[in-house]
UniProtKB/Swiss-Prot annotation:
Optimum temperature is 50 degrees Celsius. Signal peptide: none annotated. Keywords: Glycosyltransferase, Transferase. It comes from Citrus japonica. UDP-glucose-dependent glucosyltransferase catalyzing the C-glucosylation of 2-hydroxyflavanones (2-hydroxynaringenin and 2-hydroxypinocembrin) and phloretin. No activity with flavanones, flavones or flavonols. Exhibits C-glucosylation activity toward 2-phenyl-2',4',6'-trihydroxyacetophenone. Can use UDP-xylose as sugar donor, but catalytic efficiency is much lower toward UDP-xylose than toward UDP-glucose. InterPro entries: UDP-glycosyltransf_plant, UDP_glucos_trans, UDP_glycos_trans_CS. Optimum pH is 8.0-11.0. The gene is UGT708G1. Residues 283-284 are annotated as: UDP. Its EC number is 2.4.1.360. This is UDP-glycosyltransferase 708G1. GO terms for molecular function: 2-hydroxyflavanone C-glucosyltransferase activity; UDP-glucosyltransferase activity. Pfam families: UDPGT. The active site is at residues 23, 117.
Amino acid sequence: MSDSGGFDSHPHVALIPSAGMGHLTPFLRLAASLVQHHCRVTLITTYPTVSLAETQHVSHFLSAYPQVTEKRFHLLPFDPNSANATDPFFLRWEAIRRSAHLLAPLLSPPLSALITDVTLISAVLPVTINLHLPNYVLFTASARMFSLTASFPAIVASKSTSSGSVEFDDDFIEIPGLPPIPLSSVPPAVMDSKSLFATSFLENGNSFVKSNGVLINSFDALEADTLVALNGRRVVAGLPPVYAVGPLLPCEFEKRDDPSTSLILKWLDDQPEGSVVYVSFGSRLALSMEQTKELGNGLLSSGCRFLWVVKGKTVDKEDEESLKNVLGHELMEKIKDQGLVVKNWVDQDKVLSHRAVGGFVSHGGWNSLVEAARHGVPVLVWPQFGDQKINAEAVESAGLGMWVRSWGWGTELRAKGDEIGLKIKDLMANDFLREQAKRIEEEARKAIGVGGSSERTFKELIDKWKCNNNTH
C-alpha cells in the first residue's frame, strides 16, 4: 500500500480486547497487520491482567511496535460475588463490560473505527453509536461458531416457554442456511440460562446486527460454506459483512529465544521427519490428574514420539507445581525414552513448522487450529469446553483433522489411554489427512498472499476506514 496522501490519510483504528490469551493473541496479531498496512493503531488495555502471560504479551507487543498508542482503561471497582460466575476470565469480561460506559474519553481524537472483542460488543456499542464511531467485532472462534452465536437469540426466543424457561426438544439446533449443530456440541455454559456467560452470550448475539462488520480469523478454504451463508444473510437477516482476514500471522515479538525453546528445537532436530505428535491443550486449560494420566498412557501406547506441553493450573500465576508432581514419578520414568514433556511456554509456531512434527493433539482452541492449518499439520481434536466441539466440526469438515464424538467433553473422562493411543496412531498414519492438511496449508498461503481472498478483504476494510476519515 502506498504512503502517498500524507499521514492524515491513514485510518486510525482502536482495538479493545478482553481477557485470556485466546482473545488477546488474535487482537495483537490483527493490530500488527494494521500497522503493516500503514494504519495508526491505538490499543486499549486493562490491568492487572488475569494471567502473567497476558501482561508479558502486551509488553512485548508494545516494545516491538512503539508507533502503537496504548491507552489504559481504568475499570470501576468490581465485586466478583455480584456475578453468577467463578471463572476468572468470565469475571474480567464482566468487569470490563460494567465499565464500558466510561470508554468515550479513550475514543478521541476522532477514530476511523473501533474493533471490539466479541465478549464486550453489547456493552461497548451504545458508546460508539453515541459517538457515531463505526464499531467492528473481532470474533475469536470459527465462523461455524459465529453462525451459532449470531442465530442463538432467535433460537432461544422460539424455544421459550410461558414460564420463561427454554426447552430444546430435539438433539440438534437448526442454523438457517447451514447444517444443524448437535445440542451436545453447544457450550454447556450457554445452556445455563442463569449463568453470567449465557446472559452475555445472548446480549452479544443480539448486537451483531448493530455493528458495522465482523472480522474472523479464518479463510475461504477452511470454512467456505459457512462464510458464504453468513455473507448471503441466510443465517441472520440484517447481519453486517463478515470479513475472513485469516490466517492472522504470528509476529516477531511472540518469538522468544529462551532455554526451553532451544531445548525443544534441539530435541525435534534429532527426530525423523513427520514422526512427532505435538500435544498441547492451550493457555487456559489445566487437565485433571485423571485426564493427564489417561493422556500420558495413551501417548505411550501409541508408540509415537511426542512433545507434550503440560499445564498444571488454569491461571499461570498459580502454576508452581513441578512436572513430577503433575505427572507422577512412574509416568515420568516411562515417558523419558519416548517423548519430551515440558511445562514452560512453547513457541507453538516454531513447533508446528518443524519438519519432525507430523500431527497435533489439541483441545480445539481456534487460534491453535488455524496455526495447524497454516502449517499443514493434521489434528486430533479432544474438545474440553466452550466452542471447541464446534471448532472440531469445522476442522473435520475441512479435512484438516478428526475428533471422536464419543469422547464427549474432556472433563467427562470418557476417553481411556488405550483408545487415545489408537487414535493418535491413526492420526500419524493417515495419508489422506496429511494430503488434505498440505492442501489447506497451500490455500492458507494463497489467502494472505498478494491478491488472495484475505488480503483483498483487508484492503477493502482499510478503504472503508479511509472513507470514515473524511466524515470525522
